[in-house]
Amino acid sequence: TMDATGSTGSPHAIYFCSNNKLNLTNGSVLTIKNYPNDALEWDGGDGGYNVNITNSTFISDHNRSGFTGTFYATITNSKVDVVNSLGNGSNGSHFIIEDSEVNFNNNGSHGLSAGELSIDNSTVNTKNNNGMGITVNKAFTVENGSIVTVTGNAGNSSYGYAAVRLYNDYPFTVDSTSELYIEDNNNTGLYVRQGNLTVEDGAVLKITGNKVSHSLLDGYGGGIYVGYGNNY
């Protein structure tokens, strides 16, 4: 456990330079909490920043952010909680999630902000984040019995963020065995800005109870908004 309670200055927990890798294996538990800066942060370079979590647990609780930078985060048969961040839970890492439980909840801005997001036979929850619950800039795949729940997000009414935003021209797929629930969020439920979303026959897709109370995303699409809004 790394706990910054009582620390002075603005320390980071783990700072990655160049081709650094963090490997958690064989039942390891890493808890990082109460850092005024980020739990995991890169140096902004072009190295291979990898976080590999296998048969283990990672918890980021009440830090400025959980994952800051463009990491390749591979999560296999593990549990990951990124909760209570002052800012984003993550901000653009690539997440490959398999046979795992992942929670990005109660973060001060976005929850699970990803480049590529692959969810395979896993449970992913993004709940009560002030920004988007899930935002994906590249390919998005939910497959092999995965269950994804996005609820209570987009709580900051000064933004026009949706609960789920699929941003660029990539394929987005929910396969026939999987479930995606986007419910009771505080703005548009699902925003498909570009690309193609395929929900296969047999999948469960439930988008209910989302509300739009302002015009920052053109004031439309409490359920689904397709096309360019005001770049949110």
What residue spans do the PLM features occupy?
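Short linear motifs in low-complexity or flexible loops
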Residues: 21, 50-52
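Tight coil/turn sites that cap or link beta-strands
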Residues: 19, 27, 123, 139, ...
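Extracellular beta-strand/beta-solenoid scaffold signature
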Residues: 5-18, 33-47, 57-70, 79-94, ...
